[in-house]
Amino acid sequence: MSMPPYGIKPGRRKAGPHRCSALPHALGWTLLSAVLPGAGFLHSRRQRLGSLVLLLSVATVVWAAVAAPHNLRGALDLAFNPSRLTRAAVLTAVCLAAWVAVVVGTFVVLRPRPATHRWQVIGGSAFVSALCLVVVAPVGLVVRDAFAQAHVVNAVFTHNRTATRPTHVTAEDPWNGRSRVNVLLLGGDSGPYREGTRTDTMILASLDTHTGRTVTFGLPRNLMDVPFPDNSPLHALYPDGFTGPGDPGSWMLNAVYREIPILHPHVLGASADEGADAIKQAVEGATGIPVDYFVLVDFTGFRQLVDAMGGITVNVNVPVAINGQTDAGIPPTGYIQPGPDQHLDGFHALWYARGRYGADDYQRMSRQRCVVNAIIDEANPVNLLRRYQALAAAGSRVVSTDIPQQLLPAFVQLALKAKDHRAKSVLFRSSADFSPGSPDFDYMHQVVQTALAPPAHHRHHAPPSTEDDQDACAYHPGQSY
C-alpha cells in the first residue's frame, strides 16, 4: 500500500492550481494583476511565482520613486544626459515587457477550461490585448522619444567644443558668477550655388541670468570694418578691422564665418567650428560685450524644422516676395499676402524670413526677429511633446552650437524664465548716427550698454532704436517692418 507524500495527511490531496469558473471572474483578476502584478498568480494558488512577482513589482516601484527626478532641474538633468536617459529607456522597456508577460500569463492560468463558447476565447483575448495596448502605447512613445532625445543630444551637443566658449563653467555654476549670458543666433545660407556658409542672419541675444529678461541686437549683414577684441589673434591680423583688397562683399560681417577659416586656418586654436569662433569674436568687437555661445540654424533645413513644429504664426503687414532678384530684374514667383496671425508652413516661413525682393536688409532683419519670436511661442511643452520625433529628426540635422551638454538644463530653465518677459530688441539701422558702410563702433557700444541697463534706467535714457518685440511684430497693415 502506497504512502501519501511527506507532509500531507492521509485522506487529503494537495490543492492544485486554481482556475476561475467564469470568464468575467478571470478578466477581473487579470485587471487587478495589471495594477498589482502577482495578485492573479496568488489567486491561482501559484504561491511562489505570485509572491516573487509581487515582491519584484513593489521593489521596482520603490526604486523608481527614489530614482525618478523630483523637480524640474532633476528632470532636465536626466533629459540632457544621453547615457542616463538611454539606461532609463532600456529599463523602462524591460519593465514594460515584463508587465505584459505578467498580465498575459495571469489570464492564461486563470481563464476557464475548457472554454464553453468561442466568444469567450475571442472576448478574453480582445480584453487582454486592449488592456496591454492602453499601457504599452503611451509608455512605448515615451521610450521612443527618450531614445530620440539621447540621439539629438549626442548629435548636436557632444563634440561641439570651440576655442572661444567660456571656461570654468560647471553644471553647478553655469554662468561663472556673471549677471548675463550672451548667445549669438546665426542663420546660415549654404545653398547649392554658394561656396561655404554665409551668415545672413545675426542676432545677439543677451539674457539676464537671474530673471531671464532678454535684449536682442540685430546686426546688418553688410557691416564693414568690424574690429576684433584686442586680445584676439585676429586683432593682430586686422588691426583696422576686418577689411582688405578686392570685392567689398568678401569683407562684410556676413563673410567672416566663411572667410576667416580659409584665410587663417586654426588661428584661434582647435575648434569644431572655426567660422563660429571668428564670427563670435567679430560680433564681440562690434557690440563691445563678450559672445559666450552661438547657435547656427542652416537655412537649407529651416523649412523642415518649421514643418516639424507644425508651422509658425506671424503678422504679415505688407506682401513679402517669394524668390525674385531686384538687381537682376527677376520678378518673384509669388507673394505671402498681408494679414494678421498668418500661419506659415516651412516653405513660406523661410521666405518670410529671407525674402529680399523690393525690401531692404532692415525690413528683412525685422521679419527675422519676428520669426524667432514665433518659434519661441510655438515651443510650448504640449507642442514639443506632440511633435517631438519630427522636431528631433529635423533639429539634429540643421542646428549646430557650442553650448556644452552639461549646461543644457540651466539654459532650458533660463529660457523658461525668458518666456515670462517681453523681449526688447535693438536694430542697428542706417541713420544719422549709424552707417553699416562706415560704422561708429563707439556709438554701437554705447547703444548696447544703454539697452542692457536696468529697466528703471531706461525711463531717463531710452536707447536709440529699442523696440518691444511684441509691439514691433504686431499687425500694422501697410506698415513695413
Model segments located where?
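Actinobacteria-biased recognition of intrinsically disordered, low-complexity terminal regions
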Residues: 1-22
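Cytoplasmic membrane-interface segments at the C-terminal ends of transmembrane helices
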Residues: 40-48, 99-122
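Membrane-embedded alpha-helical segments of integral membrane proteins
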Residues: 58-110
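Non-catalytic, solvent-exposed segments at the cell envelope interface
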Residues: 143-481
